[in-house]
Amino acid sequence: MIIYKDCITEDEMFSDIYKIIETPDGMCLEVEGKVIQREEGAIDDALIGGNASAEFQEDDVGGSSLTSGVDIVMNHKLQETGFTKDSYKNYIKDYVKQLKAHLEKTNPERVNTFMKGAQETVKKILGNFKNYQFYTGERMNPDGMVGLLDYREDGITPFMIFFKDGLIIEKC
């Protein structure tokens, strides 16, 4: 399994169990999820990577509460946050500076391409600002990446957008 983490906070943002598409401009990854329901405290079997034990079957006793939400958010403990358009502009300006500094250390030849592409990507984000819900990593570090949640044209399929250059890949 591959885990994608925020390069600044090292918070887990998503994994390769989802459909992942690179945007045509190469700046972002779109991660497609599903709206799910889960019992409070239950662990999704899809995250375990094995088969459920035949020896122990839990009875549905009732009384447990169901929560529903987007699987990417629930499985990776992303935390919803809020922005006005102006506060997002301030955040993204600082975040792009941090990513530039990160790239200067880790991938200097990518810096110019990233800076040009980031301007266009931010314009697109601001143009669709009202469509997004915003999520940080589990630690809610304000310096870290903010994933953008939107829905496909069908109005049912959720997807999240993450800056590709803000992610580190960890194989488990």
UniProtKB/Swiss-Prot annotation:
It holds the Pfam family TCTP. GO terms for cellular component: cytoplasm. Keywords: Calcium, Cytoplasm. InterPro entries: Mss4-like_sf, Mss4/transl-control_tumour, TCTP, Translation_control_tumour_CS, Translational_control_tumour_p. Belongs to the TCTP family. PANTHER family: TRANSLATIONALLY CONTROLLED TUMOR PROTEIN-RELATED (PTHR11991), TRANSLATIONALLY-CONTROLLED TUMOR PROTEIN (PTHR11991:SF0). Involved in calcium binding and microtubule stabilization. This is Translationally-controlled tumor protein homolog. It comes from Xenopus laevis.
